[in-house]
A protein has these predicted regions:
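Conserved catalytic-core segment of NTP-binding enzymes
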Residues: 115, 120-168
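Loop/turn-to-beta-strand initiation segments
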Residues: 33, 78-80, 111-117, 137
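Short, ordered loop/turn segments at secondary-structure junctions
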Residues: 12, 39-41, 77, 86-87, ...
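P-loop/Walker-type NTP enzyme "switch/lid" segment
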Residues: 37-111
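Walker A/P-loop phosphate-binding motif and the immediately C-terminal alpha-helix
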Residues: 2-40
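Alpha-helical segments flanking ligand/cofactor-binding loops in enzyme cores
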Residues: 25, 107, 129-130
Length: 168
C-alpha cells in the first residue's frame, strides 16, 4: 500500500519544493520505491532541483497524449517523478473532474510506489486542497516570517473548516 504525503505551504518561497525533492530523494536512496508528483500545476519546478528535463508532463496525461505510466521519469537516484509542467495553461485551469481523474490514475500505476510525495502548489487553491485531501499525511512548510505563519494558519484553517480535511 502506498503512503501519500502532501507537502504544502500557505505562501510561496518558503522551501516547500526543496523539502519535497530532498525528502523524496532521501527515501529513494534508502531503496524505498518513491514517486514525487510536482502538483504545483502549470508552475512546477521540482525538475530544476532534480537536474532533469522530463520528456512528458502531467499535461500529456490530462490531454490523453500519454498514459500515467508514460509521464513518469526515473532519475539517476531511482526516484520516480511526474512533472506538473511549467507555463502550461491547461494545468492552471483544471476542473474538479480532471483533478480527480489525476488522483484516481495513481491507482493504475503498474508498479505502485511505497511512498508518493506531492509537492502541492502554495496557498489554498482548489487544486492544492484536492491533492491535500487525497493524502494520508500533510506537511505544512513555513518560515519564521510573520506572513508565513499567518498564511500557514489560514491554509490549515481553510483545509479543516472549508474542505473538511482532517489528516494528520
Amino acid at each position: 500500500m502506498t503512503t501519500t504525503i502532501a507537502i504544502a505551504s500557505g505562501k510561496g518561497g518558503v522551501g516547500k519544493t526543496t523539502i519535497s525533492v530532498n525528502l523524496s530523494l532521501s527515501l529513494a536512496l534508502q531503496n524505498k520505491e518513491t514517486l514525487l508528483l510536482d502538483a504545483d500545476l502549470g508552475m512546477a519546478n521540482s525538475h530544476i532541483l532534480l537536474g532533469i528535463n522530463p520528456k512528458f508532463t502531467l499535461d500529456d496525461f490530462v490531454t490523453g497524449k500519454s498514459s500515467i505510466d508514460d509521464v513518469i521519469t526515473i532519475t539517476k537516484d531511482k526516484l520516480k517523478f511526474i512533472s506538473g509542467g511549467s507555463a502550461i495553461n491547461n494545468l492552471l485551469n483544471l476542473s474538479n473532474l480532471e483533478r480527480h481523474k489525476i488522483i484516481q490514475s495513481f491507482n493504475n500505476i503498474k508498479k505502485r510506489p511505497e511512498y508518493m510525495l506531492i509537492d502541492v502548489g502554495a496557498g489554498a487553491e482548489a487544486s492544492s486542497m484536492t491533492f491535500m485531501a487525497s493524502s494520508d499525511k500533510i506537511i505544512i512548510v513555513l518560515t519564521g516570517e510573520p506572513t508565513s505563519f499567518i498564511d500557514a494558519y489560514s491554509l490549515i484553517k481553510a483545509a479543516f473548516l472549508d474542505y473538511k480535511i482532517n489528516v494528520p
